[in-house]
């Protein structure tokens, strides 16, 4: 049975080992460095999904990110004070078991417990999943580097509906 927990310094190598298996060997240190930065900075966190001691998924969130990109002024204003989900991954063999949902709920709880107004994210293909399972609402669609992306958000108010 799997479980969700906050990643700690001692988890860095296991995360890189278990989730970096498909990366070229020279890319694993890059992953390890990125994971370490998420764990060490106080304004962000990394959650991991574990099956026994094997890391099978992760999610990352930043409390008060710098909002960049080609967003309208209205969208930027709406996203102020919201934490940003910056990553979500579940190993292929573990998908459709509720792990992704548990990781998203852990991030939302983290943001709300820190006094945040809500959370937002950018997605290419999973917008319907976030709307259906968590009540996220579409803020804006953009094209970045030729790829269509959807900006979604969920606030305390929309969470209670």
Ranges and model annotations:
Residues 24-50, 60, 66:
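Active-site rim helix/loop that mediates acceptor-substrate recognition in acyltransferases
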Residues 113, 117, 124-148:
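Conserved active-site alpha-helix within GNAT-family acetyltransferase domains
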Residues 1-10, 158-161:
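Conserved N-terminal entry element of GNAT/NAT acetyltransferase domains
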Residues 90, 96-109:
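Conserved acetyl-CoA-binding loop-helix of GNAT-fold acetyltransferases
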Residues 7, 88-90:
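Hydrophobic adenine-recognition pocket in adenosine-nucleotide-binding enzymes
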Residues 26, 50, 54-87, 95, ...:
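Conserved acyl-donor/pantetheine-binding loop and adjacent beta-alpha core of acyl/acetyltransferases
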Residues 85, 119-122:
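Conserved hydrophobic beta-strand within the GNAT/NAT acetyltransferase core sheet
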